Amino acid sequence: MSHHSPPPPKHKGEHKGHGLPRGSERGSSSRGKDRSASVSNSVPMPAGGKASRTNCPPPAPQKTANRLINEKSPYLLQHAHNPVDWYPWGQEAFDKAKKENKPIFLSVGYSTCHWCHMMEEESFQNEEIGHLLNENFVSVMVDREERPDVDKVYMTFVQATSSGGGWPMNVWLTPSLQPFVGGTYFPPEDGLTRVGFRTVLMRICDQWKQNKNTLLENSQRVTTALLARSEISVGDRQLPPSAATMNSRCFQQLDEGYDEEYGGFAEAPKFPTPVILNFLFSYWLSHRVTQDGSRAQQMALHTLKMMANGGIRDHVGQGFHRYSTDRQWHIPHFEKMLYDQAQLSVVYCQAFQISGDEFFSDVAKGILQYVTRNLSHRSGGFYSAEDADSPPERGVKPQEGALYLWTVKEVQQLLPEPVGGASEPLTSGQLLMKHYGLSEAGNINPTQDVNGEMHGQNVLTVRDSLELTGARYGLEVEAVRALLNTGLEKLFQARKHRPKAHLDNKMLAAWNGLMVSGFAVAGSVLGMEKLVTQATNGAKFLKRHMFDVSSGRLKRTCYAGAGGTVEQSNPPCWGFLEDYAFVVRGLLDLYEASQESSWLEWALRLQDIQDKLFWDSHGGGYFCSEAELGTDLPLRLKDDQDGAEPSANSVSAHNLLRLHGLTGHKDWMDKCVCLLTAFSERMRRVPVALPEMVRALSAQQQTLKQIVICGDPQAKDTKALLQCVHSIYIPNKVLILADGDPSSFLSRQLPFLSNLRRVEDRATVYIFENQACSMPITDPCELRKLLHQ
């Protein structure tokens, strides 16, 4: 009989209803839900009661560090003093399991994960549980951000055999690494409706001793089934599906799950999911004259505005938290992830391009201000995340959200100044509290605070418009804006004195690539050269610290060392598909923002390496990992869902299209078509699970615009034309600067550039689309009209 328990923390954006995708979101909130274990298994398990204790009493507490002390990962180092005899993922652990004929206990998480902290504190620091693990299992700890391939393979098993997934992910493997039982967070002891970790360990231990052959057979059967289920191949298909059909179906599925009042999609917990917003903007552009097109734009803009006004946004320190635990975007899970900041900075810039509303550009600037201040290494790289938990005061146990919460008393003490010109007696603190919904009792529903840690605390969330707040107190809008900004700055300065949340100072190539895109796109759209410079510094960091010149390969990780140094793991952790895809995207965005062709050259080189390491020459599309790197794993998978991060295959499809437009090389287009064809069945089945790939499908079937500007890169007229292009939302384009040098890199790639001439010695634009060329344009206003058509 299987273990039955309440639902697990949801994995990677799992949504109930409305046909929305289970993407790559992280586990949901610790508040308002029973965060019990989820157990999946491929074999019968004994029912009821605790298993018999088959081992001698545990030894005296172990004070020395385990072998994880030699690792670089912040997550592994957090477990380096556990009594558990942890191994990192590797041959030493596998050999030990085979030699001693023991199952492997694999635990996967990441350093800013609330429930990973909980399980470590409750179970992995427990001497008796540590002894139980050491005697009966080979225990392996993995940082999912270092080894996304390991995470994806075993999460596929957990999701397929249980009601969901999340982190920490705990899976039991045969010595040959095939999974047979899996789950998420386990409490240490049995409860009324849930099975404790100690009991699960003893049951599995008994089963391994009594029914090992059955375990092995069932494990092999499940692995075979997962392999067949995860197959993605061109098969006998010749072409990808119709973009018009996939667009329409994807939009309809999103429309069905849309929250009319608060924006967003499906039920709480609500995630930002920028890939969905990107799709809606693209859908609007190609359906502007239709009701559905207007609806798509409204859905995206309303969602972005509600998110920015909600508690999911840090109004004091800027940036966005991981997700909202309620449909109102009010109470967040307070973790902050680099990849969210990167993608949201881009989508808020797109909202500004489309609407012209500076509200959206201000949000984008705030995100990038936060990243610059909190997540940036001085050499140009970007850190991974900040934890949700921090001590309310020094020496106290960390609590979720402690850094971000406020009491009325605190705000009154910080902002006691009277507001001049108000229609009634009013302090700056009272104005801020009214605008952001603070109350004496706190504005957090007790059902969202199951541990009672947030009583009397408040999350800042915009309750009224500036106009309404001003009207309530007889103040001008600009006066209200200034008073609120001053108040928020004082709160920010006060917050500096609180204990900081843990910073995961691991730097990942993939997420750094996304952040290069964020700074490059924002810099070009907003006309802020300093942001383009930060993107450039990020790309230089990648090339200096995360690129192996001799092999041309990317390294997955590096780490912040003492004194601002950068440290590498030894041996290096080599890049995965997402590292190449996201870095290539970042370099292409940086090329368009800076017009420095060296970034395009590097992008082409990385794309070549990506094709050699990850391309499936038989079935089409890209595998997540290199063939050699994943030889130990039972599955070699292809990333097939756009979630918190876009699928690397979706991003690669866009990259291939752009590279074809920038070089004219037919191979890139052929690969793109093959990739889209391989994913045909996935798109047809649930297009809303791949909105970024549906966008790529549309771009491939509609063809890209080639916008060529002939001019001196430093001349004012050239810059005016470039800024005109950057200010308009044109997702399916490539932007090329032809400086007239026939020996330049781009002229060698696209010989026709040498034939283009400036008109009357002025910077001139030519637009190529559907094998046709526009008349030459020199006037930015005329160019704007043409691009808006």
Curated annotation (Swiss-Prot):
GO terms for cellular component: extracellular region
**Keywords attached to this entry:** Developmental protein, Differentiation, Phosphoprotein, Secreted, Spermatogenesis
Which segments show compositional bias classed as Basic residues? 1-19
The record's InterPro entries line, in alphabetical order, gives: 6-hairpin_glycosidase_sf (IPR008928), 6hp_glycosidase-like_sf (IPR012341), Ssp411 (IPR024705), Ssp411-like_TRX (IPR004879), Thioredoxin-like_sf (IPR036249)
At what positions is Phosphoserine found? 5, 652
Q: What is its main location?
A: secreted
Which compartments is it annotated to reside in? Secreted
Record CDD domains: SSP411 (cd02955)
Please give the tissue specificity annotation from the record for this chain: Testis-specific and age-dependent (at protein level). Highly expressed. Expressed in round spermatids located in the inner half-layer of the seminiferous epithelium as well as in early elongated spermatids having cytoplasmic protrusions into the tubular lumen.
Q: Which GO biological process categories is it annotated with?
A: carbohydrate metabolic process; cell differentiation; spermatogenesis
Per the record, the domain of life is Eukaryota
Keyword Oxidoreductase appears in the UniProt entry: no
The segment annotated Disordered runs over: 1-65
Work out whether the entry's keyword set contains Secreted: yes
Q: What does this protein do?
A: May play a role in fertility regulation.
Supply the name of the protein: Spermatogenesis-associated protein 20
